[in-house]
Amino acid sequence: MACVVSWNCRSLRSKVCRIKDLIYEVHRVCIALQETYLKPADIAKLKRCSLVRKDNENESGRASGGVALLVSHDTPSSVITLHTNLQAVAVRVMFSNLVTVCTLYFPPSTSVDERDLNRLVDELPTPFIILGDFNGHSPLWGSKNTNLRGRQIEEFVNTHSLCLLNNGEDTYFHQRSRTFLNQVRFAPGIIWSLSFRSRVTPKWMSVI
C-alpha cells in the first residue's frame, strides 16, 4: 500500500541521506517534512522527486522552521497554491483517489490565529490530510497533559469535524530535553473511505 511519511527532520540538508533512504523504500509516495531550516536561496533537489517548500527566516535572518513536501515523480500530483501566512504547503496526490496532502508547522513560541487555521482548511480541496508538528500537547495524541496550543488544536478538530489519525502513542522523544514533541495528523471523516492506517516508526516518523 502506498503511504505518506511525516517527519520533523530538523534540517533537510543534514538529513539528505536518510531522506533518500525513505524515497527509495517501496511505496513512499509522499514525504511531509517540518523544520527544514532552508532559506529561499538554498538549493535542495532530490532525484525522481518534486519538492514543494515554504522557507522561513527569523528576525536575525537565520533559517528557522520551514516545511516541504516530497512527491515521487511516479505519482501524479499537482501543487495547491495556498494564500496563508502559516508555514504550510499542500499537494494534490493520486492514491486510489485524489487526496490533498498538507504539511504544517507551528513554532512553539508563536501564537496561532484560529482564523488562519480556518482559512487554511477552506483552501484545501477535500478529501485532505494535514500532517505536522504543532507543538501542542493533548491526551488525544499521546501527551500526558494539555497546553493552550493543544486545546486550540482540539477545538480546531471539533470545529471542522476532522478525524485524528494518531494512534494515541507519544510521537517524538527529544533526548536533550527529555520531552515528547507532538506530530499530529488529521483529516475529514470522508478520508476513512481510502483505508488509511496510522503508525509511528521507531525513528519517530509518522507513517500513514
Protein language model regions, located:
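A shared catalytic/ligand-binding motif for oxyanion handling
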Residues: 1-208
